[in-house]
Each structure stands twice: as C-alpha cells, then as structure tokens.
Design a protein with these regions (language model features):
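Short, solvent-exposed aromatic-acidic interface loops
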Residues: 95-99, 165-169, 226-230
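Conserved, well-ordered active-site substructure
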Residues: 129-145, 153, 198-215, 220-251, ...
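A short, polar/proline- and glycine-enriched secondary-structure boundary/capping micro-motif
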Residues: 100-103, 170-176, 206, 232-238
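Conserved hydrophobic/aromatic beta-strand scaffold that supports enzyme active sites
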Residues: 77-81, 150, 186, 212, ...
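Zymogen propeptides
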Residues: 2-150, 160
C-alpha cells in the first residue's frame, strides 16, 4: 500500500511539473498567431522619385526626416524630426504581420519587411495579457488594465493620451482612432510635463534606454531613443525624458517600450546601441513597430 501511495505521489508530481512547464512555455515562448494582417501598401502610387538621402536625413515631396544626436544626462540621445504631407505615412506593423502571443521579430526586420524609411519599436503588446491593442482601426484586444495610459493616433495624424481604464475602443475608433498603443505613461500632455520626479517610482526613477514619440504641431513629429545601461550612456528617467521632449517643443509625448527593446532604425541601419538587461549589445525581438513609409 505504501509503495502504491508513493508511486501515485511520483506520478502526480511529474504531471504537476509537466503542466507548470507547459503553462510557462505557453505564456512566454510558444508563438500563437491569432490574426494574420494583410497590409495593403496603398501608398505606392504616391512615392516620389525626387529623393534626397544622407547618413542622417531623408527628404522627398511627402516625407522629411532629420536625425540628430544629443548628449545630456550622461546619455546618448537620438532624435528624429519627421514632417509629413499626409498622416497616411505614419504607420504601425506587427511582427511577422501577425497579431498573437509571443509573435516577435526585430525592429529592423519588421522595418525592412514593410519597406519602412524609419522605424522605432512600439509598445510590445505581446508581453502583457491586458491593454488595448488597436491597429489600422481594427480592435485586436479590448481588455483594459488598471490606470495605464494609452497613446491614441488618430486618422488625421493627431496624438492624444488617454487613461485606459474605462476607455471604449469601439467609440474611439468611431471617433477616428487609427492606432492605440498601451505602455506609457504620457510624458507631455497639452504642452505640459505630465510626470514628476516623485511619480511612478518603479519606472521613472530608474535610468534606462527609452523610446518615445511626440508631436509638435500638425504632422510634425519627434521620435526619441536613448541609449542606456553602459558606462558610455547611463540612460534616462521618465522625468528626464519628459523634460527633454518638452524642451523640443512637443505638445504631446508618450513613452513607448524601453529597456532592451529601445531601437531606432533608419534607411537600412540601426542608429542607437540596443542593450539587453545583461549589458549585451543585442537587438531584441518585439511585437510591433511604429514607422514612417509608403
């Protein structure tokens, strides 16, 4: 009898271990593609033949991109100033053009796959089970999280920061929301810094690589990526990032996924120095990008 009880105990223990391993793999490793996104490149006919490209700039009749490197707070900061003739050139893309759990791809790979001119990493929605996910007016996830702030990119190219809790994605889409990204927080709202030195201590007080997007006025955007976690570049707190973007004149600015995800890609090359949590120079695979292109 004791042997049988011991045997059943071993069997139960093995089953429990197997189940636990499966849950962990299913949550963090196994890729599950729920929706394949067929992105039609409807803007090809607007592409201009008159293109001027340098190491840090791109210009045609519809798109102007200028990249400048700054050095503040013992940190290397890369700023892309983007001016568009139409909001259709501000776009987003999923890894492998598929929405789903653990579906990831490097920012550079997504940029190249979508013929982007410029790109940064997005909100890495796949790392969380909650948070609104809206792309190109399609609601992929409507489960909200407590008090997280979202970035709404409207069809006219304007940006807004909203509180996710209580937000109605269907109503937002009806009102013109094209993309909703869920990471945050908002850095600048209505031309005022929206974080303080003492707020959101878990994020804001740590110096890290950062990615952010902001808008100065109609179709005039600022993208910022900072290096961090190295002796050469310390990284920014959220307050330092917000202050920096405010000084650039943005009216709205929003913090995207940072840390090892922070990547700025331009015209076939990575501009910043992506850094893992272990201090290794390596580009991380993520769920999505925000990009400029036709």
């Amino acid at each position: 009898m004791k042997i049988k009880k011991h045997l059943w105990g071993l069997i139960y223990g093995c089953l429990l271990i197997c189940f636990t391993v499966y849950v962990l793999l299913d949550t963090f490793v196994i890729a599950r593609e729920y929706v394949i996104v067929d992105k039609e490149n409807s803007n090809n006919n607007s592409f201009s033949d008159e293109v001027i490209i340098t190491d840090n700039s791109y210009s045609d009749e519809n798109i102007s991109i200028t990249i400048t490197e700054y050095r503040e707070h013992d940190t290397n900061i890369y700023v892309a100033e983007v001016i568009l003739s139409s909001p259709e050139y501000l776009q987003t893309a999923f890894a492998k053009n598929a929405y789903g759990r653990n579906v990831t791809q490097k920012t550079s790979e997504m940029a190249e796959a979508n013929n982007a001119i410029f790109a940064v990493n997005g909100d890495y929605y796949g790392a969380r089970e909650t948070g609104l996910v809206v792309r190109d007016g399609v609601i992929y996830r409507d489960s909200s999280s407590r008090d997280r702030e979202n970035l709404v990119i409207y069809a006219d190219g304007s940006l807004d920061v909203i509180t996710e809790r209580g937000a109605d994605p269907e109503k937002l889409v009806e009102d013109g929301a094209l993309h909703i990204l869920s990471f945050g927080p908002g850095l600048v709202v209505d031309g005022e810094i929206a974080v303080s030195k003492n707020e959101e201590v878990g994020q804001a007080m740590a110096s890290n690589p950062r990615t952010a997007i902001g808008i100065i006025d109609d179709l005039h955007y600022i993208f910022v990526v900072s290096d961090g976690r190295t002796d050469e570049s310390e990284g920014l707190s959220l307050y330092e990032l917000a202050t920096f973007m405010d000084e650039l004149g943005v009216q709205v600015a929003y913090n995207l996924d940072g840390g090892g995800s922070s990547t700025m890609w331009f015209n076939g090359k990575i501009i910043n120095v992506p850094m893992s949590s272990k201090g290794i120079n390596k580009e991380r695979s993520v769920s999505d990008i925000v990009y400029i292109g036709y």
